[in-house]
Amino acid sequence: MDTNILLENGTNELEVLEFTLNNNHYGINVVKIREILAYQPVTPIPNAQPSVEGIFMPRDAMITVINLKQCLSLPVEGEQKGLFIITNFNKLDLAFHVDEVIGIHRVSWADIIEPDSTINAGENGVSTGVIKLDGKLVIILDFEKIVTDISPDTGLKVSDIEERGERQRCDSPILMAEDSPLLSKLITDCLKKSGYTNLNVNNNGKEAWDKLQEYKKEGTVHDKVHCIITDIEMPIMDGHRLTKLVKSDSELKDIPLIIFSSLVNEEMRRKGESLGADAQLTKPEIGQLVDTVDQLIDRAEK
């Protein structure tokens, strides 16, 4: 699937594929999608998690099929047909079984509403945002959270940090932008175990940018921010837009900035580099994130 125009040059835009499950409307960032296939019979896997329908092999590549209705506790009625949305993120190829694909919409992250606590119950929520399209509400699903719930081993490798043991405390302040409550907590816990205790956590790029502007006015930005870690997908302002703003600002551009996202692939890496990101890592690589923070902060403070 052609995604060349997506999130280009930090425009704060994305394309959302709208699909349905039991006549409810949901969305996924097109950047995650490899292709869409018609339903094919799958081979069940013994003792698999209930949401895993089975496996199939398009073009000799084995792919696990996940039933989104099961994941969202929706009724699974009648004969299963529909479509498979084949995705790639966190270095995984997966198929999500849906009823129907409605179309693709280009939208701004600023138009995506952050779900409140009634929709997203903290770390248990599976929605990253809600957007109004053609008079209806479309829920943007947190596919990383859905997959991690099914198979925790696909998430952050917290064991990478635990194996290193406790480290000496480091007071270097880090500014974070991450919209997922679960991932935000996991990343924060891992950084604290690695000695980084001075963390300023924000729910999206706009919150992080506003903090940077506040510190600039105070004249304290270089005392309060020694490194920035940002996700890409976030409501209101995405990580690419935040990166562009930081690296275009004469007072902020020398602050090390790391993009830490499930979307980092070859194409997205090129976009991040063009915007000036100092490093880009995929989300399972939490151990590598800590190593990169060590290197960039050490280099900046010399």
Language model features with spans:
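Conserved acidic segment of CheY-like receiver
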Residues: N23, C170-L191, I228
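Flexible, small-/acidic-enriched active-site or ligand-binding loops
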Residues: I36-V52, V101-K132
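Receiver (REC) domain active-site loop signature in two-component systems and cognate sites
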Residues: D60, M234
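Acidic, metal-coordinating helix/loop segments flanking the phosphotransfer/catalytic sites
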Residues: V201-C227
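Acidic catalytic/metal-coordinating carboxylates
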Residues: N204, D238-R241
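Active-site residues of response regulator receiver
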Residues: D231, S261
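Short amphipathic alpha-helix used as the core "switch/output" element in two-component signaling
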Residues: H240-K253
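Alpha4 helix (beta4-alpha4-beta5 surface) of REC/receiver domains from two-component response regulators
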Residues: R241, V264-T282
